[in-house]
Amino acid sequence: MKIRPYQTEDRDAVIALWDACGLLRAWNNPYRDIERKLGVQPELFLVGIDANQRIIASAMAGFDGHRGWVNYLAVAPDKRRLSLGRQLMNEAERLLAERGCPKLNLQVRTGNLEVLEFYRKLGYVQDDVVSFGKRLIHDQTQA
C-alpha cells in the first residue's frame, strides 16, 4: 500500500470506503466533513492506495496544538488483517510527532470490540475520561 495525502478526485471513493466500513452516520455529512478537513491541515488527510490505484484505506488526522486526533480510520473489508491500518496509524503518528504533538487521542464506539483491540495492540490505552459532545452545526445527510 502506498500512503499519500487525499486529493479532490478521491472524494467518492473515500466516502464509499467509509460506507463499506460502517463509519457513516446520518448526523455526520461525509461531504461536509471532507470540505472542513480540506480547510484545516489537509496534508494530514491520508489515503492508502493499492497497485491498481484503488483507495483501500483512509485516516483523517489533525493537531490542535494540545492533542492530536485521528478520525475516519478505515481499511477496505477485503484488505483487513494485512497490517494496513497499522501502517496508516504509524504514518499519522509520524506526521503528528513532526508537528510536536505530545499525545494522540481517538474515539471508538464502545461496542466496536474488534477496533478497540486493534488500538490496544498498537499501544493505545483507555483514558479515564468521559467524552462529551455538543452539536454546533446540524448537517445531517440527505435521505
Where are these regions (language model features)?
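Conserved acetyl-CoA pyrophosphate-binding loop and the N-cap/start of the following alpha-helix
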Residues: 79, 83-91
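Extreme N-terminal starter segment of soluble prokaryotic enzymes
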Residues: 1-2
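Conserved beta-strand-loop-alpha-helix junction that forms the acyl-donor binding cleft
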Residues: 106-115, 133-137
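Acetyl-CoA-dependent GNAT
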Residues: 5-72, 76, 90-91, 95, ...
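Residue-level recognition of specific faces of alpha-helices
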Residues: 69-72, 107, 118
